[in-house]
Amino acid sequence: IEELSKRLASAGMPKSSKKKTESEILKLKQMSPMSAEATVVRSYIDWMLSVPWRKKSKISSDILAAKDILENDHHGLNDVKDRIIEYLAVQKRVDKLKGPVLCLVGPPGVGKTSLGESIARATNRKFVRMALGGVRDEAEIRGHRRTYIGSMPGKIVQKLAKVGVKNPLFLLDEIDKMGQDHRGDPASALLEVLDPEQNDTFNDNYLEVDYDLSDVMFICTSNSMNIPLPLLDRMEIIKIPGYMEEEKKNIASRFLLPKQLFNNGLSQSELQISDRSMLDLIRFYTREAGVRGLEKEIAKICRKVVKKAALAKDQTASLTKIVPKDLEQYLGIKKFNFGEAESKDEVGQVTGLAVTSVGGDLLTIEVAAVPGKGSHNRTGSLGDVMQESVQAATTVVRSRAKALNIEKGFHENIDLHVHIPEGATPKDGPSAGIGICTAMISALTSIPARGSVAMTGEITLRGQVLAIGGLKEKLLAAHRGSIKTVIIPDANKRDLKEIPSKILKELEVIPISWIDELLDIALTKNPLTLLADSKDSLDDGAEQDLKIVERQGISAH
């Protein structure tokens, strides 16, 4: 007990916490050392004394050194790096600066978690990581009350006690993977932790005293924005898009290859992968926004080279140079067809663009028109919003049927089947609206859609094209898939400033406001133009339809 009193005197606790601990020590004095209650009280006092109340790391104020660390550890990711340098710059001028709460949102394998470690080194903070994937119990965050047998503080307090300072960098990994059940909602418990206005009085259920978390720098990582809104509101979101081919090649040469050579006991004089081979490796053996799959493929090559050396008579590896034709020998047949989207023009088939948890992707949209009774089939695991997009696209086509030279009453005697492969993958969202509409027009007019054109945009019943999200990821996917032309909503023109100039040079990006502007670009022939050539033979109703189209700013000629 004397030892506990000495530790308490040097702990630097606030008055209220010190008073609480003193009363517990007094209680312990009056108990039998062998009683179960004494063990509980002793455990509580130990936790109170283990938590860092005053001890801090000295935060680095050397901005240039921090910048060098961030640049050397990660390629690209300029938004995050700028935000950290801004924080360090402000810190030099302000005595008490609350730690920022950043949330890095991006696909797997882009370096979110490893970036957290780099930021800790750049700011000279100790690094603590807490995986939130699968956490369902509120007590994991806030701790259990002392009335429970075997109760402990929450993971936040436990990790701080383990690291020994009150201002570490705390990485909350996979914050979007938290669940909830009858034991409470951990996302709601995190509201207090991540709110800079409240977290200086964080109350753990076990400690029962206020603890100041305002010195902690919290960084959260997530694969999607599927995070409860109140929690999202408390964090500063920094989106990390996928890497471009050139960036992947640089990362592989500078970081991944040297790392795998070291892990597999090889030297640079034993294995070299040419730039062209690295590009083919990225194109034909991986399809991802990050570089995790690329690292696995490089590791596979390294293992094969080591095996070859182990089976050789002299047990040493001579220099192995990997050229493009060698990849099949080391990695097997090609897994992906690079440039597959550049296939021939097909009737009723359009390339759309989507955003998934692993970045942007190409989406094939198929529509078949067959004689029947006017039924509509939708297959391909479509979500509610996408099913509504199909209905909206159908109405747009019906309202323009005469102007598009589509058979009168087609909705009563033609069955339309909308299918979006791959069938087992769930799909949702409104951004495939113009793709579905174009595929329907192509199927009903028998005019092929251009295979080298991809499109994204939400459609209204009047045929107006509305803005979508994730434009950068979608354009990166189009670039990866060798698409030549991408049609986007006019409202997304402002987002083009964030797109790398290399992508914009190699892609023709065309903004549109109405579905009618799309037909000249996406179809091999424009049904409006075909109809205009025989305008004199139109009946009054069709003439009126054509005027509607012209009034929306699209000339039929």
PLM segments and residue spans:
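Conserved alpha-helical scaffold flanking the Walker A/P-loop in AAA+ ATPase domains
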Residues: 147-171, 203-210, 475
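Peripheral, non-AAA+ core regions of ATP-driven protein-machinery
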Residues: 319, 340, 346-351, 359-557
